[in-house]
UniProtKB/Swiss-Prot annotation:
GO terms for molecular function: N-acetyl-gamma-glutamyl-phosphate reductase activity; NAD binding; NADP+ binding. Its EC number is 1.2.1.38. CDD domains: AGPR_1_C, AGPR_1_N. Keywords: Amino-acid biosynthesis, Arginine biosynthesis, Cytoplasm, NADP, Oxidoreductase. One of its GO terms (biological process) is L-arginine biosynthetic process. Pathway: Amino-acid biosynthesis; L-arginine biosynthesis; N(2)-acetyl-L-ornithine from L-glutamate: step 3/4. It catalyses: N-acetyl-L-glutamate 5-semialdehyde + phosphate + NADP(+) = N-acetyl-L-glutamyl 5-phosphate + NADPH + H(+). It is found in: Cytoplasm. This is N-acetyl-gamma-glutamyl-phosphate reductase.
Length: 346
């Protein structure tokens, strides 16, 4: 059994991670940490785990954590995974970070967007961007995996076939994305108060969202040249889910059916990416509770643009599920281990 620790186990992503790992046949949940609920059983904080997860939550003790665990997941705000990563490297253990500390390769960009000093810069070259559909082979050998952000996951998977096949003008990419409130985290804030979100729909982080440089970095690698995007996220009155609507100008004439075939070829054999038939569009309900990313492409002949729709569950494929998928890749296990389920409906 692989001894696993989860740091930040009582955030939304952390709790989903614990739930998924509890059903993993090769994992022993060895240590769960929580700054807020240390000393309490996990099931007392999350009653849906009663009789399933018996661990008592602990305060973070990095030497103890690294000594007792083979693989560590960090589900923490940015800036907090760096000291853990340094100890992981010293002790030859493995880390999957659900935060932003190791996603951006340019430390100056990280510090500009996150307003935080990067104290583990030497480890950036050791970190692998954890999108298995694109980086599976290098994830297998990695020590530090930077689990992608939720918005970037939906956007990058949505655009990858177009950029690798050089089918769109990379200067015209517009991303209009909507997320459920759980994407804002479990901490209290006025913005996510029930009275503020119910029956409301609002943009936020307009032209300033921190996922922007992550999206641009990965799209540029796919395109082979710098990419700049216009990215506007929105907060919707639902609990979970992301729907990204992406617009790009086509370079050559192509039909919806031809593009759909190109996408299916690109994602052939991928367990968690579902390319929908022409005329069928993704919904957040269609992926809720699953590790799937549903994608459709439509050619607007009149404007010579392609419209890509990409839907994920922000807490699963956008966070915890993708982290477990990365664990499976690292261990050489089937990628759907502990993830082999459809979503919940209705």
């Amino acid at each position: 059994m692989i001894k696993v620790g989860v740091v930040g186990a009582t955030g939304y992503a952390g709790a989903e991670l614990v739930r998924l790992l509890s059903r993993h046949p090769k994992v022993e949940l060895t240590m769960l940490t929580s700054q807020t609920y240390a000393g309490k059983p996990m099931w007392e904080v999350f009653p849906h785990l009663y009789g399933i997860v018996d661990n008592t939550l602990e305060e973070l003790n990095i030497p103890k954590l690294v000594a007792n665990c083979d693989v560590i997941f960090t589900a923490l705000p940015h800036g907090h995974a760096m000291p853990i990563a340094q100890e992981v490297m010293k002790k030859s253990k493995r880390l999957i970070d659900l935060g932003a500390d190791f996603r951006l390769k340019d430390v100056n960009i990280y510090q500009a967007w996150y307003k935080t000093e990067h104290t583990a810069q030497l480890l950036l070259n050791n970190a692998v961007y954890g999108l298995p559909e694109l980086y599976r082979e290098i994830i297998k050998q990695s020590v530090i995996v930077a689990n992608p952000g939720c918005y970037p996951t939906s956007v990058i998977l949505g655009l990858a076939p177009l950029l690798t096949n050089e089918m769109v003008d990379t200067k015209t990419l517009i991303i209009d994305a909507k997320s459920g409130v759980s994407g804002a985290g479990r901490g209290l804030s006025l913005k996510t108060h029930f009275s503020e979100t119910t029956n409301n729909f609002q943009a936020y982080g307009v032209a300033t969202h921190r996922h922007t440089p992550e999206i641009e970095q990965e799209l540029a690698l796919l395109a082979g040249n710098p990419v700049t995007v216009s990215f506007t996220p929105h907060l919707t009155p639902m609990i979970r889910g992301i729907l990204s609507t992406i617009y790009a100008s086509l370079i050559n004439n192509v039909t919806t059916e031809e593009l759909t075939a190109i996408y299916r070829q690109f994602y052939q054999g991928e367990r968690f990416v579902r390319v929908l038939p022409a005329g069928m569009y993704p919904t957040t309900k269609g992926v809720a509770g699953s590790n799937h990313c549903d994608i459709s492409v439509t050619v607007d002949v009149r404007t010579k643009r392609v419209i890509v729709l990409s839907a994920i569950d922000n807490l699963i494929k956008g966070a915890a599920g993708q982290a477990v998928q990365n664990l499976n890749v690292m261990l050489g296990l089937p990628e759907d281990t502990a993830l082999d389920f459809a979503g919940i409906y209705p």
